[in-house]
Amino acid sequence: MISSGISVIVCCYNSAARLPETLKHLAMQLVPGNISWEVIIVDNASTDSTSEIAENEWQKYDQPSEKLRIVNEKEPGLSYARQKGAQEASYKYLIFCDDDNWLNSSYISNAFIIMENDPKIGALGGKSTATTDDNQFPEWFESKQNGFAVGSQSPVQGDVSQTCGLWGAGMVTRTELYLKSFNKMYPSILVGRKGEILSSGEDTEFCYRLLLMGYRLFYDETLTFVHFISKERWSPDYIERSIKSCETGVFDSMELNKYSLLNKLVYTKKTLKPILIVKTFLGYLSTLAGRTSWSFAESKIIFYYYSQIDLGVDKNTKDIFSFYKENRQ
């Protein structure tokens, strides 16, 4: 049985230059003696000295050497790296700390207490500020900072299940839930992120799967971290890669809409379901006859959810529905 405590998962791809400051902040965590914790570096097919730097940096601080573990994941991709980290975790809670996230010294202890106090929290997020190695941020950065996992994730604290998802940066979750959410039977339906590919909707997909399982998303500003953003992030090369990633982003957005629709249906009042079944089927027939602009794909999904009658829904929709039926608490 997995032990009580927190495993901090740091997924790395060529992170040698970014790791020292990140590990410094992890080594400086103020964690009470009754809370067990560890740091797991997942070297995700790096071609630099990521693993060596991690080991050497950790030795600089007054922390037991066994508190840091380095594991390798040869399959490139953030989802593979996170899965490897979760599989290796010794403790029941996970913190996904990006290689450029500098966690506040109370992050681990606060995260543990919040998760322990509410068993229905599936994922927990915090607030970040940004720093850079450039002289200053570009003029446009403040208006776009949320896309860089910077700032507040919500105008209100507490349950944000129906208002927003959570960033993967600094996200806290339960090890069991992460392993249950993504596995061989139910892998991600998204294209995913590999190496230098920038587009990724895995964080949002994970949040949707938690909601389908009956868990909640929480936001708490006692969890704070600094997000280091290199000036390379606004270089022409990086911007070009961002533009190229938009094709993947469009696909991901279409697939995530299926999760969004199913979650809405799950929380629809039972008294409205018969009405929606009839309305949806009539809308479907009208669509076939070319008499309405009713969303053809959406009508099939809604009818499938309520009646289990397949009018031609795609495989991903069926997989999402199967995941919901098997894992709903």
Task: Label the model's feature ranges.
Residues 25, 43-53, 101:
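A conserved acidic beta->alpha catalytic loop
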Residues 73-89:
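Glycine-rich, basic loop-to-helix element that forms the pyrophosphate-binding segment
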Residues 106-140:
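Conserved donor NDP-sugar-binding/catalytic core segment of glycosyltransferases
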Residues 143-163:
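Short, flexible, basic/aromatic active-site loop/helix in glycosyltransferases
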